[in-house]
Amino acid sequence: SDVYKRQDKNAAQQGYLTSEPFAIAKAGVKANTLMFSDQGYPAYATTISCMEKTVKDRGAAVASFVKASMEGWKSYLADPAPANALIKKDNPNMTDEQLAYSVAKLKEMGMATGGDAATMGIGIMTDARAKASYDFLVDAKLIDPAKVKLAETYTTSFVKDLKVLP
């Protein structure tokens, strides 16, 4: 959405820290960035979702995909040029300036490499953080614990032993 183009001081827009603040600034609008994590929201920003049947029937393929994804993040952060060329090929509207901003923000905030990832590996998911996220959603009455059990919402089996360290 281009809500920022209206320059309404009461407008809000949800977005990615690596993208929307850059676009808003490029549009000449001064904006404040508020992080959900700063407000106590413990959930992971991005996870890999997969159907239960796929995990059961094609677990090796899922494991390979997860591993390649984590290694891809490590490679991208070490040398973004090859991936950026592919991004620009598929999205001709993408600029070098936007990509540089995104990589800088990823690194500055430790979005893929900070927190538990620094010692446990990129893409790590912990039981403690999954429980904190679940409890937050239960407390906010967004999940009914009688209908949704924590143990059925995630698995660490594909990431716990990967240790793709930054």
Model regions: which residues?
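Active-site-proximal glycine-rich helix-loop-beta segment
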Residues: 8-10
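A ligand-binding cleft/hinge motif common to bilobed small-molecule-binding domains
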Residues: 12-30, 110
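Conserved C-terminal helix/tail region of periplasmic/extracytoplasmic solute-binding proteins
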Residues: 128-166
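A bilobed periplasmic-binding-protein/Venus flytrap-type ligand-binding module shared by bacterial periplasmic
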Residues: 45-61
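Short beta-strand->loop
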Residues: 30-43
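Secondary-structure end/capping motifs
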Residues: 57-140
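Short, small-residue-biased leader/transition segments that mark boundaries at the very start
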Residues: 2-4
